[in-house]
């Protein structure tokens, strides 16, 4: 049996909390993506009132586990897993809120983009640095980012690999709210409960 890298808590207020728990950087390994897809499909089959996805106190998700990219075939396989998992998150028939503390980079940013709303802490930063590895975002990020911030800003972020901090993310429409790190989870839960 594989290690549980994602925990789900269904609260009495109708909110389901999905917690990423894959080590220090919350990398989205192939096993995390499989578990995320399974969790999202379960939340679609038996939906709660709303969903909050959280990482750790210091990092939302660092993106793909690049140690798994041993060649083009593995990269394609992981790309498919990303697309399947993030599409499953986007398909949850309730409001899904990403509570973003610290970096949400690469696939971590794409996970936040697959959510309906993004509440972030003042220390959050978003970015699609895949171009620096010679690849482009493969989990739906090119489309979802453009829908949120417009095609021109999306091209800037995707083609440069530039990262944006919380205040800029709020200004350009990538984040919906910015709160202190201490308030992040409680604010995301409060917002989710208002939809539940």
Residue ranges and their predicted role:
Residues 1-54, 87:
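Conserved CoA-thioester-binding segment of acyl-CoA-metabolizing enzymes
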Residues 32-35, 55-88, 104, 132-134:
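Glycine- (often His-adjacent) and acidic-residue-rich active-site loop
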Residues 18, 53, 65, 111-113, ...:
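Hydrophobic/aromatic residues within transmembrane alpha-helices
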